[in-house]
């Protein structure tokens, strides 16, 4: 769910920047993240200053903007500067004085030719960032959409003259000359159709990032949509929501965090991006998903920017430091899963108890597949819950040639001093009645 603050305009230059619940920026259409730095100040070079300085935050360079996000201890508002407003980037000159000061990048921006200084307080690739800033500014990616729309409108404006008279008012040729002319026009029409086809193909390729961006916005709206108040949801609406979730998972992540763009903050930013991404797979999996399955889903969404299992594990362990609604959990068996913080083990145990105390299951027990159908989760996750219930004394296991089955634990209800007394109350009595049906 995207969160933002009220729009700010410091000196008419800064814009409000939307961020997700984990602190990642919400990118715009066709916008791609290029570089990330930590411990960055943004100051005004003018005297008196023309805007309030921004202190100690993360600076994210994209193809369209410079996005400044405050650190956790900072109460400033996430802000951005559009690269389209930058009119000049000053060249960096090394001097003896610069060796004893924090590295700085200065640029001029409209309105009013404001001189802005980016101050590096932490350790970062200064030269790499400056080079990427020049590249993004000169690339002018924000103008590509206007150019593509203009070319598309021009490509469809041509028409072929028909009838007795041509476009210039002259009479069309007939006879053999007319046949040759007609054949030439057909070749020209075919050539034009091929050119249009290739233009459409190029346009389709150029729209790929736009489609991913659209999917990301729809994903944010879907996550922020309020749930039904009466607890009931229309079946058709629910089906459409699940179909939309599956489609968005297949589209992928608009701008995956990479080691090249994030540098030393790679695992931190990867952790934030994973926290945003995991919410839909978690909802689809019933609130809990194994780390192995999430590795598959996350790498599939990242496309060619694959991560290692160790990177995924480190990203999950960093959730303890962030205020995110998900967490990493390790069962006694060693299986690691991702689950919502709102997940309640007591509720799961209650549902398992209801399952194993039914008349049928009192006789034959339950398997992991049976529990998976009841809990609406994967069988592997259901097995972990059954093992956890066994550890808590709720269940007993039975290893047989047919596999592992779990039964309700009746031992606490049996009097060890008189094993032959049958209680008329409790689950033990119900078990006696259920098993007696087998002899009838």
Swiss-Prot record:
Chain ranges passing through the membrane: none
Annotated keywords: Coiled coil, Endosome, Protein transport, Transport
Residue numbers spanned by region Disordered: 144-163
Entry keyword annotation includes Lyase: no
Keyword Transport: yes
Location of the GLUE C-terminal domain: 115-149
Superkingdom of this protein's organism: Eukaryota
Gene Ontology CC entries for this record: early endosome; ESCRT II complex; late endosome; plasma membrane
InterPro entries noted in UniProt: GLUE_dom, PH-like_dom_sf, Snf8/Vps36, Vps36, WH-like_DNA-bd_sf, WH_DNA-bd_sf
Compartment annotation: Endosome
BP GO annotations: embryo development ending in seed dormancy; endosome transport via multivesicular body sorting pathway; multivesicular body sorting pathway; protein transport; seedling development; vacuole organization
Domain called GLUE N-terminal: residue spans: 17-97
GO terms, molecular function: phosphatidylinositol-3-phosphate binding; ubiquitin binding
Coiled coil: 192-212
Family annotation (PANTHER family): VACUOLAR PROTEIN-SORTING-ASSOCIATED PROTEIN 36 (PTHR13128:SF12)
Assembly mode: Component of the endosomal sorting required for transport complex II (ESCRT-II), composed of VPS22, VPS25 and VPS36.
Role summary: Component of the ESCRT-II complex (endosomal sorting complex required for transport II), which is required for multivesicular body (MVB) formation and sorting of endosomal cargo proteins into MVBs. The ESCRT-II complex is probably involved in the recruitment of the ESCRT-III complex.
UniProt record similarity statement: Belongs to the VPS36 family.
Name of protein: Vacuolar protein sorting-associated protein 36
Gene expressing this chain: VPS36
């Amino acid at each position: 769910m995207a969160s933002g603050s009220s729009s700010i305009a410091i000196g008419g230059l800064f814009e409000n920047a939307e961020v997700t619940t984990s602190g990642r920026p919400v990118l715009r259409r066709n916008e791609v993240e290029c570089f990330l730095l930590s411990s960055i100040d943004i100051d005004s070079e003018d005297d008196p200053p023309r805007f309030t300085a921004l202190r100690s935050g993360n600076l994210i360079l994209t193809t369209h903007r410079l996005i400044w996000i405050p650190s956790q201890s900072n109460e400033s508002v996430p802000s951005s500067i559009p690269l389209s407003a930058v009119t000049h980037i000053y060249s960096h000159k090394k001097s003896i004085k610069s060796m004893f000061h924090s590295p700085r990048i200065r640029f001029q921006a409209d309105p009013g030719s404001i001189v802005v200084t980016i101050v590096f307080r932490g350790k970062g690739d200064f030269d790499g960032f400056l080079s990427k800033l020049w590249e993004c500014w000169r690339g002018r990616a924000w103008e590509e959409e206007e150019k593509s729309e203009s070319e598309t409108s021009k490509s469809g404006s041509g028409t072929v003259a028909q009838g007795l008279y041509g476009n210039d008012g002259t009479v069309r040729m007939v006879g053999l000359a007319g046949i040759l002319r007609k054949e030439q026009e057909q070749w020209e029409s075919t050539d034009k159709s091929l050119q249009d086809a290739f233009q459409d193909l190029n346009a389709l390729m150029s729209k790929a990032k736009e489609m991913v961006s659209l999917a990301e916005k729809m994903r944010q709206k879907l996550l922020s949509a309020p749930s039904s108040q009466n607890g009931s949801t229309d079946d058709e609406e629910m089906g459409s929501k699940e179909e939309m979730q599956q489609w968005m998972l297949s589209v992928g992540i608009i701008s995956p965090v990479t080691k090249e763009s994030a540098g030393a903050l790679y695992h931190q930013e990867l952790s934030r991006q994973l926290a945003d991404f995991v919410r839909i797979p978690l909802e689809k999996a019933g609130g809990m998903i194994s780390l192995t399955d999430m590795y598959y889903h996350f790498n599939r969404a990242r496309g060619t920017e694959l991560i290692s299992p160790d990177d995924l594990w480190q990203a999950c362990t960093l959730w303890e430091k962030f205020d995110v609604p998900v967490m990493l959990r390790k069962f006694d068996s060693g299986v690691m899963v991702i689950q919502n913080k709102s997940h309640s083990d007591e509720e799961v145990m209650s549902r398992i108890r209801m399952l194993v105390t039914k008349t049928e299951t009192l006789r034959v027990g339950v398997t992991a597949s049976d529990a998976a159908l009841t809990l609406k989760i994967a069988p592997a996750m259901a097995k972990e819950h059954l093992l956890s219930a066994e550890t808590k004394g709720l269940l007993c296991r039975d290893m047989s040639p047919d596999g592992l089955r779990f039964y309700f634990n009746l031992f606490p209800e049996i009097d060890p001093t008189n094993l032959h007394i049958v209680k008329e109350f409790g689950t033990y009595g119900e078990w006696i009645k259920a098993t007696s049906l087998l002899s009838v």
